[in-house]
Every structure is written in structure tokens, then in C-alpha cells.
């Protein structure tokens, strides 16, 4: 069944004038879109043992709200929020959530549930399992995510992740497609005019480049099991057929979509790259396609070491400044042929 590639494009008017932003989507996302923080719930029964508390603090990044009572984490730099549910005193909603989890997986306590979000309301599970399995999960850090972050901070506009499939011929076909199409797109794509003018300023010293690369992840790489399982859960049918998956990632580790290898073609790659490299006409993050990957990277400090960061991007519910926002308009980004 054909996928529909949709992006919401928002127009802000002052009287009859249109306030345009000429910054490319990938750069606007890099400078202004904070990654969505995940929600973490630790189910336990009675007080945690000392070794369990030590394990929790050892395996989770320090930028998790609720992990330590002695440290305050700035919300905009938080990777997530951790809450504790003691099943001996849990309320009805918490018990219902736990009962659903314990029916589908190991119910050994302590048990951690990690949930992400698409937009402001839609939650989906990122990982779940006993605390004893957390070390092998590599929730926030892996070699691929370290390299992907390095490339994005060095100026790559989009990093295309390639998760290999079971069929080596299909894997090689996707490699050849990426090897051919990405240099072609670098020559074809032109950035919007007016970058640097009032309303379209750049704030980071990261070079603004028309540069696209791909990063391969072996499906059997245990160090990348978190990413592989996440992408596979989004495309289970294609994964069961052994297909490779391709994921364009931009900004601060935002995945645009998980694309089966059988659907990747030059037209689709061009359409998606034009969207990500075009003027950011929708500054509201939640109204753009994609979802944020869990990455232990302090983007703010890396991008703005001197503290000269841009004003925060608007989110749903915030006004558009002077004047009124026109109704959002749907832009269909076709799959290609």
C-alpha cells in the first residue's frame, strides 16, 4: 500500500504580508528544534536495592530528569523524564499499564518502560524490559549514533541510515543507489535565497553545506540493537521479508521516515531531499513529519558553545507573533514513480 509523505506547511501573516523563513528545513531543525524527551517509567515493588540504584545511575545518562534528586536538569537539554511506580502503592491507571506490560514480556522487577512521542500527544514504546537487560539495550548511545551526530554537527544536511537486510543482492542495490543518487542530489539541490537576511539568520558556526551521506548498520550488529529493533517495529512486514531499510536523518537526530528498500527510488529521494533542503515554511516542529531518535548528545553546547543560540522555535499552542496564523495547509510529498 502506497505511503503518503505529508508535511504541514504553516503560513504566518501580518495583514496581507507573508513572513517567510528562508532557512533550509534541515538547518532550522538543527539550530532550533530540541529533540522530544522520552518518558521513562520504572516499575518496582518496595524500595529499590542499593545495587539497583547504582545500576540505574550508571546506565542512564545524567541528563535524565528525576534520576537524581541532587541535580537539576534544564528541560530543553533533558533526554527524558524518569518516574518511579511502586506496585505496592500504584493507582488504578498504573496497575492497568503494568498488567498490560507483564502479559506480553518478562515481568521481572524492576522493569523499565521507555516511551517516545510523535507530535505532542501520540506516544509509542521505544523499549521495555527488566532493569537487568538495560546495559545490553544501548538506549541512548551506540557507534552509529555517535558517528551520525558527528556528521550532522560537521555540516551534513542529511545522513541516510541503511539497515541491511538478509538479501545481499538487495543490500548492494541500495548501496549503489545511494552512492549514485546522493552526489547527484548534491549537484542538483540549490539552497533557498535570502539566507542571512532578517528572519532567516544562522546562529551556529556549523558550515551550511549541500552535503548528503549514508551510514550503514549491519542488521546483526548487537551494538545497534536498539535502533534496529525500533526501525523493524515500524516496518515489521518488510523486515520479515528480509528487506533493507533506509532512514533519512536530519537536524538533531530526527528521522523523517523508515523506508523499505523496495520503495526507495530516485524520484522519492529527490522529493524528500528537496523538502529537507527547501525553505522552512513550517516553524512548528510538531506539525512536521518525523520522530526523534534517542541520542546522548548535548546539541545545545555543541552548536552554541558561546551561548549565542537563536530564539526558541514555536510549538503548537503558541502564537505566531504579530497577526494571526492562517490555517495549516497540507503539502503532499509524493512517493515518486
Go through each PLM region and give its residues.
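Bacterial N-terminal signal peptides
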Residues: 7-17
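Bacterial N-terminal signal peptides that target proteins for export
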Residues: 1-7
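Non-globular targeting/processing and membrane-anchoring segments
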Residues: 19-337
Amino acid at each position: 500500500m502506497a505511503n503518503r509523505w505529508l508535511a504541514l506547511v504553516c503560513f504566518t501573516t501580518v495583514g496581507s504580508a507573508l513572513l517567510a523563513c528562508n532557512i533550509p528545513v534541515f538547518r532550522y531543525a538543527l539550530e532550533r528544534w530540541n529533540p522530544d524527551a522520552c518518558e521513562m517509567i520504572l516499575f518496582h515493588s518496595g524500595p529499590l536495592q542499593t545495587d539497583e540504584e547504582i545500576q540505574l545511575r550508571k546506565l542512564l545518562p545524567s541528563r535524565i530528569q528525576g534520576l537524581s534528586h541532587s541535580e537539576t536538569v534544564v528541560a530543553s537539554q533533558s533526554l527524558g523524564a524518569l518516574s518511579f511506580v511502586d506496585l505496592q502503592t500504584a493507582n488504578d491507571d498504573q496497575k492497568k499499564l503494568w498488567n498490560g506490560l507483564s502479559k506480553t514480556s518478562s515481568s521481572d522487577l524492576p522493569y523499565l518502560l521507555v516511551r517516545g512521542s510523535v507530535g505532542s500527544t501520540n506516544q509509542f514504546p521505544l523499549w521495555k524490559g527488566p532493569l537487568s537487560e538495560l546495559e545490553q539495550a544501548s538506549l541512548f548511545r551506540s557507534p552509529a549514533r555517535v558517528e551520525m551526530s558527528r556528521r550532522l554537527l560537521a555540516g551534513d544536511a542529511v545522513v541516510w541510515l541503511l539497515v541491511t537486510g538478509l538479501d545481499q543482492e538487495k543490500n548492494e542495490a541500495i548501496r549503489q543507489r545511494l552512492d549514485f543518487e546522493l552526489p547527484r542530489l548534491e549537484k542538483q539541490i540549490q539552497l533557498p535565497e535570502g539566507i542571512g537576511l532578517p528572519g532567516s539568520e544562522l546562529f551556529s558556526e556549523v558550515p551550511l553545506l549541500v552535503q548528503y551521506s549514508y551510514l550503514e548498520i549491519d542488521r546483526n550488529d548487537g551494538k545497534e540493537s536498539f535502533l534496529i529493533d525500533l526501525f523493524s517495529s515500524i516496518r515489521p512486514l518488510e523486515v520479515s521479508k528480509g528487506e533493507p531499510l533506509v532512514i533519512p536523518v536530519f537536524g538533531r537526530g530526527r528521522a523523517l521516515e523508515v523506508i523499505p528498500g523496495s520503495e526507495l527510488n530516485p524520484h522519492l529521494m529527490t522529493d524528500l531531499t528537496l523538502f529537507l533542503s527547501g525553505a522552512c515554511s513550517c516553524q512548528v516542529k510538531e506539525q512536521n513529519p518525523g520522530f526523534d531518535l534517542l541520542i546522548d548528545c548535548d546539541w545545545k553546547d555543541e552548536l552554541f558553545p558561546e551561548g549565542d543560540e537563536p530564539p526558541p522555535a514555536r510549538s503548537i499552542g503558541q502564537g505566531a507573533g504579530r497577526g494571526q496564523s492562517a490555517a495549516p495547509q497540507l503539502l503532499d510529498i509524493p512517493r515518486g514513480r
